[in-house]
Amino acid sequence: MTTENQDALSEIASAATLADLEAIRVRTLGKSGTITALLKTLGAMTPDQRQAEGPKIHALREAVTAAIADRKASLEGAALEARLATETLDMSLPVSAGMQGSVHPVAQVMDELAEIFADLGFAVATGPEIEDDWHNFTALNIPETHPARAMHDTFYFPDREDGKKMLLRTHTSPVQIRTMMTEKPPIRIIAPGRTYRSDSDATHTPMFHQVEGLVIDRGIHMGHLKWTLETFVKAFFERDDIVLRLRPSFFPFTEPSAEVDVGFTWEKGRRVIGGDPAAGNGGWMEILGSGMVHPRVIANCGLDPDEWQGFAFGCGIDRLAMLKYGMDDLRAFFDGDLRWLRHYGFAALDVPTLSGGVGA
């Protein structure tokens, strides 16, 4: 047994490759191996013989197993050293560019709006996109005969058993209603989000993004509204030469109401917000609607209109993005074209800040 042990260990130590070592393992410890055959003889031995020979055979198997493991580790280590000696890594080579996503212009503009109005003391409020008829129309002083309630302009859901009409909200004004009903004045919020109307062309889509603002407090008047809008538009377009014009208009939920125009100039064939609209290359462009919150709307929310007044405004986020960043077709916003997104998208770390410029 001692001779067999020495021969096996010597053969293992002299194995030059992993393949040679595996052949030795199979020849000694495999199903038909020499040591396996010795283990099988234990069953035919007498108890005295088994007691004398068993420990020797088991010791031989353990010694061979350990020697094979040690030699395998040695050969693998040598192979690794040899491979590393032939491989080099050129640290001066440029790294392959990884795939990067981009922030959609609508999401970027939403962040810009939140940053600007947060500096003015406004909070961001949200609400459900599936609304009931009362929050979307009735509470906002929109009569049953108003065209906005028509099926061709609003997406309605099938009638419910309780008779309540459900629809996809046509504006984010219901967020204002819910806020006035659940929070105590004074209130300063903006309500950005998705809205839905049955319309589709180069400047309209069935789903679009809108932001509305609401201020409720004592002694609020049109001067507060005009200052807020001027401050917002100047910060958003990052120009101090912004000129606004308020034109009398009509909205059921505000009284008085005003359409807000902004002055622009033509530069290289494109309209650029800012500058003197009275100049030969200038003009006016409507960008949002606004007005003092109608007393009936305030009363519908459980507040006393004799004590509380407020103003509201609203505009399309997609339209703001088009005016600021030069997109021509609103439908491209939702086509999912990677070329368009790479061109107009923003880097993930390009976070809007007032100190660095909201459009930086």
From Swiss-Prot:
PROSITE patterns in the cross-refs: AA_TRNA_LIGASE_II (PS50862)
Major location category of this protein: cytoplasm
Binding site for Mg(2+): E255
UniProt record, GO biological process: phenylalanyl-tRNA aminoacylation
Cofactors demanded by this protein: Mg(2+)
Signal peptide region: none
Pfam families named among the record's database cross-references: Phe_tRNA-synt_N, tRNA-synt_2d
Top enzyme class: ligase
Record-listed E.C. numbers: 6.1.1.20
Alphabetical UniProt keywords: Aminoacyl-tRNA synthetase, ATP-binding, Cytoplasm, Ligase, Magnesium, Metal-binding, Nucleotide-binding, Protein biosynthesis
A molecular function (GO) term: ATP binding
Reaction equations catalysed: tRNA(Phe) + L-phenylalanine + ATP = L-phenylalanyl-tRNA(Phe) + AMP + diphosphate + H(+)
The keyword Signal is annotated on this UniProt entry: no
Cellular location(s): Cytoplasm
NCBIfam families associated with the record: pheS
Subunit structure: Tetramer of two alpha and two beta subunits.
Record protein name field: Phenylalanine--tRNA ligase alpha subunit
Lineage: Bacteria, Pseudomonadati, Pseudomonadota, Alphaproteobacteria, Sphingomonadales
